[in-house]
Amino acid sequence: REPSGNSNGLTLNRTGRLLACEHGNRRVSIADIGGTEETFVDAYEGKKLNSPNDVVVHSSDAVYFTDPPYGIKPEQMEQPCAGVYRVDPDGAIRCVIADFEKPNGLAFSPDESVLYIDDSHHQHIRAFDVAADGSLNNGRMFADLSDDGDGVPDGMKVDQEGNLYATNALGIWVYNPAGDFLGLISVPEVPANCAWGEDGR
């Protein structure tokens, strides 16, 4: 649709509706297959979000998204941090992580026991255990990319084997579930995200 509100991260929820992180509109929108859309979330504790960047949906229907300040000027920032948020099925919104500088891509492990989140400012990827109540615990370094000059992590996806694919200016980094670097997939352009087809490719 046009205008798109500078949409970035996209994903489908469990009923096939499209969630879109709209930088320009400072919100996450939700749309049905016919194109009818509405605001899913645009504020936390009465203050506007920064500029939502990427979004994932848990099998419980909880929605997690990152909210860096990329799409706004510093003086427009109303939130006290660049947070990672969870919207529960009942509509309650919670800030689950508040110590990132610029949270960007995020992806679940195949069994949803781990949520990976990257910080483009610090050039690293962290892993968090996902508790039964949806909270994130035991945050730890998964991959430190700060030695790779232009290697700023962006959108991420996890395959069926649990390997993590992180896009960046150099291509697509691939890591196994233990955080070991497996290799770089070179591409002709600068990828901002990636996705899987029905055949797993």
Model regions: which residues?
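Beta-rich, blade/repeat-based domains predominating
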Residues: E2-E22, R27, E45-F65, E78-G83, ...
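A short loop-to-beta-strand structural motif that recurs across blades of beta-propeller domains
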Residues: R27-S29, A82-Y85, H124-R126, G171-W173
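Short coil turn/linker residues within repeat-based beta-strand modules
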Residues: G34-T36, P89-G91, H122, A132, ...
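Residue-level detector of beta-propeller blades
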Residues: A92-C95, N138-M141, F181
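Anionic-ligand-binding alpha/beta catalytic cores of soluble enzymes and soluble regulatory domains
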Residues: Y116-D118
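Short loop/turn segments immediately following beta-strands, especially the blade-tip
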Residues: A127-S135
